[in-house]
Amino acid sequence: MRLIIVSGRSGSGKSTALDVLEDNGFYCIDNLPAGLLPQLAEDALINTELLQPKVAVSIDARNLPSHLTRFPELLEEARARNIQCDVLFLDADEDMLLKRFSETRRRHPLTNANRSLAEAIRVESDLLGPIADLADLKIDTTNLNLYQLRDSIKLRLLNQPEPGTAFLVESFGFKRGMPVDADLVFDVRCLPNPYWKPELREHSGLDQPVIDYLAAQPDVEDMYNDISGYLLKWLPRFAASNRAYVTIAIGCTGGHHRSVYITERLGQHLQQTLKNVQVRHRDL
């Protein structure tokens, strides 16, 4: 039995997440009262009509505040049923949430005559704090379009060949912001930049000319060896501590050359010693 709890601030992509899960065989329930979570887990577990039952529910700020405050206790009760229970928390920065509500002209569930949209978003953050604190996986949707969000959910939640900690090695560009859901961040902007080579500028770190250029740089090799040595030593400790998800982010200026090259090499190397290692290039 697998239960995925989807939460997050309004406008962050919860409906999209439920759509993806439903498309992949999950029985989905929107806006479940949090107080019913243990009973739902019990009912789904004993439902003999479902083979390998998969259930996904969204729990958001429309719940009773007292139920949201009790979420840690309710989650513990659900997990006591001996089921796999993952908490996915989606979020975006406040400016992006304001922009999305402005574009769609939808009403925020917590706005009223005495509370502005910006105030409602901040109140919602406080209400959902107990869920965010216990999230197994957080996805920042600020810079993701609909299709990228769908791909990210499928990659992180549904593409796990074996049980255990799921590791994601992700490249990114600092000019578009650092991924807020990263557990470990490595800055490789000090390395030689292929962007300043006219013949390499239009290529990415996946292309052989850039690979050859970076592989020949001593500083690049030293940086790669230091990062890979650190990860090979400490990632197994993360797995041993029962972490469900670990994201390793490698950043350069634009997210096209250096970070992509390092990320690809690290992903291939880590896949030889760890299970469930995935690679993603955010800004390609």
From Swiss-Prot:
It comes from the Bacteria. The keyword Secreted does not apply. The keyword RNA-binding does not apply. ATP binds at residues 8-15. Pfam families: PapZ_C (PF22740), RapZ-like_N (PF03668). Keywords: ATP-binding, GTP-binding, Nucleotide-binding. GTP binds at residues 60-63. One of its GO terms (molecular function) is GTP binding. Belongs to the RapZ-like family. Displays ATPase and GTPase activities. This is Nucleotide-binding protein PputGB1_0956. It comes from Pseudomonas putida (strain GB-1).
